[in-house]
C-alpha cells in the first residue's frame, strides 16, 4: 500500500518520537474495509519502533490513537488514506509535540478554557481538500484540552449514518449530536463556535500590545507586512488564516515565474516568507472592533486581546459569497453548498442550480454536469 519512498519519509518523520503510540483497531471481521485499514496502519507502524497496532474484533470500523497506552481522544472511523493520510500523521506527531501549526499561546489558552466534556464528530470524504484542515484543527484541540474527544468519520463507509444525520456536504461537524459547522474552516472559527456552544472558563485580561503597523488580511496583507518590516517597522499581521481564500484554489498557473502551484502551497509559501522577517503572525483571530483613540487605531479581537498602532492597513481578502435569502443559512449542508469538488457527489443524478455566471460559476457547472442529471446556471 505504501511504496518504499513514502516509508523512507515516514521513518524520517517518526525518528524523533519520544512516546510510544498504538493504533487501537476495532473492526468487524467481515467489514469490507478491514484489510485495507489493517494493512495501512501496520505499514505505518512498521516505520518506527515507537508505533504499534492492536487489533480487536468489534462492530463497525474505527481506531483510537493511544499514547503510552492512554486514550488521546482522537478517533478515526475511516481508512485515512487520500487527503486524510496527513491527518493521521499529524495526529501522531502533534501528540508527541513534534508536529507543526501549533496555535500560539493565547489561542492555546482559549482552547484549554473550553468547558467540557465535548464530543465532536466530523463527517468527511477522502477526496475533500477542505476536510483535513477541519480534522487537524479539532484533533489539535483534543490534544490541548482533555475534555474534548473527536471522531473523524468517512461518509462513504458509513452511508446509513450519513443519511440518518442528513449530511449533504463535507466537512460537517457535530457537537454532541448538534450540527455546528459545514464546509471549510479555520481553527479560530471552530474555536469560536465551540465557545458559543459550551462556554469557557474566564481568562485573565491580556495586556494590549503596541506596534508601528497592524495589517489585517490575506495575500495583499502579507505583501504590505513584508514591505513595512523591510523599512524597520514593528509589524503584526492579524488574520483568520494566512492566504485567505487563496487556500481554496486548486491550481494556479498565472503567477509569473511560478509555472504551477496550488492555493495551499502558495499560502504556505507566504507564511514562510513572512517568517523571514520580524513580523508577529497572529492567526485564528477575528477582529470584532476598530476604534481610534488619541491617534491610535485600537483593534479588539475575539477572545479579549487588543492591539494598537498609529497605522492600520486593511486588506481583508475574499470569502464565499452568499445570497442572503431566507432559508440559506438553515440549509447550508442540506441542499446549499459552495464546493462542487467536495460536495458535488452528494447531488449525483439530481437537478442542481449554480448561482453565478462568472469563471468559478461556469467551472462549477461544467464539473457538475458530469454527475448531475441537470445543471442550470443563474
What are these regions (language model features)?
Residues 32-41, 247-306:
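N-terminal Rossmann-like dinucleotide/flavin-binding domain of flavoprotein oxidoreductases
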Residues 206-242, 324, 332, 338-378:
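Rossmann-like dinucleotide/flavin-binding elements
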Residues 178-189, 199-216, 243, 247, ...:
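FAD-binding core/adjacent interface of flavoenzyme oxidoreductases
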Residues 98-113, 201-207, 212-213:
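Long, charged amphipathic helices and adjacent flexible linkers at domain junctions
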Residues 49-59, 146-160:
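Thiol-based oxidoreductase modules, predominantly thioredoxin-like and allied folds used
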Residues 3-42, 111-146, 152:
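Local sequence-structure signature of Cys/Sec-based thiol-disulfide redox active-site neighborhoods
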Residues 57-74, 159-176:
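Structural micro-motif
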Residues 67-99, 174-201:
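Non-catalytic, surface beta->alpha helical segment in thiol-disulfide oxidoreductase systems
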